[in-house]
């Protein structure tokens, strides 16, 4: 038996020997094996990111689940639980559109949406809005998913309007007016029908043929913009107009308006009289930088929708209300997480 008061280690021909002459192995091989083992462990923890196209997103996103998810996202944002800068925009002129970057850190996720708006695309038969959403693991920064964001943008916008309508519109609302005939108009009909039992839907679009086709699809009536708005309990403006299409003089007392177009500081959908009612927004900061309806009218914002949902401000639903929606990254991340969780659950990842 060899007694080693001080542990002795010697190296002979690349092999390490400790006390008693036991071979401990080649140190170079140990380093290589450890590195390989470490790499394997990292790869096991870092699964390959999920890639989802629009049809896969559609498969996993349900409006019934999206509306409450948007309510929570709005509450979290207004409560200061979300880190989110105002959308960063690069103007693309021509064709008079923009490229936007929308990152957010939420209580449940981290990611960014990249969005483009190209108005001339409408004449080409392709979407005017296109987007991609990138999710990462908040704990490690590892990529989780890359998914198409066009449908998410369309659906989450309508879901937020549904949350506003549920909160602010009369519970016995019967007539819905839709100004516009594009994807947002269609998505809003789907979402708003989940929160109110409308008996009649009136449609207007700048292009009469588009309005008539859309009205036929959803079982509505196509008419002039004034005819559509007068008498309506809920109004949606979902147009690409840069000048007002909705006049406040047409609004029924106590009606609710979801204004979802005009997302630039010099664009408008509503005139000053319409904006003279009780105005709600998704984000005060964003509205004061991006909303021409708010900026150019000079109208004071009453509350963020998340503040009302959280009970921090009364809804004032008995008055004529305007919800100016600009869209926020927190909404995109919340919606993308619904899709990601459903997709990974189905695949067993």
Q: What are the roles of these predicted feature ranges?
A:
Residues 168-175, 197, 252-253:
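Short helix-loop-beta connector
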Residues 220-296:
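Rossmann-like adenosine-cofactor binding region
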Residues 54, 58, 264-349:
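Adenosine-phosphate binding glycine-rich loop
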Residues 46-154, 162, 172, 329-333, ...:
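N-terminal ligand-binding/catalytic initiation module
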Residues 194-218:
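NAD(P)-binding Rossmann-fold cofactor-contacting core
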Residues 185-186:
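N-terminal Rossmann-fold NAD(P) dinucleotide-binding loop
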Residues 1-46:
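Intrinsic disorder/low-complexity segments
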Residues 181-182:
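Glycine-rich Rossmann-fold phosphate-binding loop(s) that bind the pyrophosphate
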């Amino acid at each position: 038996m060899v007694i080693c008061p001080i542990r002795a280690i010697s190296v002979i021909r690349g092999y390490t020997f400790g006390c008693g002459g036991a071979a401990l192995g080649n140190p170079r091989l140990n380093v290589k094996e450890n590195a390989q083992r470490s790499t394997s462990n990292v790869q096991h923890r870092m699964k390959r990111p999920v890639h989802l196209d629009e049809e896969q997103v559609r498969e996993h996103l349900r409006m019934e689940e999206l509306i409450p998810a948007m309510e929570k996202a709005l509450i979290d944002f207004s409560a200061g639980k979300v880190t989110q800068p105002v959308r960063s925009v690069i103007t693309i002129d021509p064709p008079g559109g923009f490229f936007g970057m929308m990152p957010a850190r939420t209580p449940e996720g981290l990611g960014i949406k990249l969005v483009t708006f190209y108005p001339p695309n409408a004449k080409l038969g392709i979407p005017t809005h296109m987007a991609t959403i990138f999710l990462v693991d908040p704990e490690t920064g590892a990529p989780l998913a890359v998914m198409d964001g066009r449908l998410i943008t369309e659906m989450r916008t309508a879901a937020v309007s549904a949350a506003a309508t549920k909160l602010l519109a009369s519970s016995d609302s019967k007539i819905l007016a839709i100004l516009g005939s594009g994807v947002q108009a269609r998505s809003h009909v789907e979402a708003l029908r989940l929160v109110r039992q409308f008996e009649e839907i009136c449609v207007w679009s700048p292009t009469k043929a588009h309005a008539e086709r859309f009205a036929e699809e959803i079982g509505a009536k196509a008419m002039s913009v004034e005819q559509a708005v007068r008498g309506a309990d809920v109004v949606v403006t979902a147009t690409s107009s840069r000048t007002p299409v909705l006049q406040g003089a047409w609004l029924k007392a106590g009606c609710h308006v979801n204004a979802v177009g005009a997302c630039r500081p010099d664009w408008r959908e509503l005139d000053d009289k319409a904006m003279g009612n009780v105005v709600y927004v998704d984000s005060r900061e964003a509205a004061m930088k991006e909303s021409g309806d708010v900026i150019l009218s000079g109208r004071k914002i009453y509350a963020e929708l998340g503040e009302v949902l959280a009970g921090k401000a009364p809804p004032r639903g008995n008055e004529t209300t305007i919800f100016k929606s600009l869209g926020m990254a927190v909404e995109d991340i919340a919606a993308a997480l619904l899709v990601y969780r459903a997709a990974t659950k189905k695949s067993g990842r």
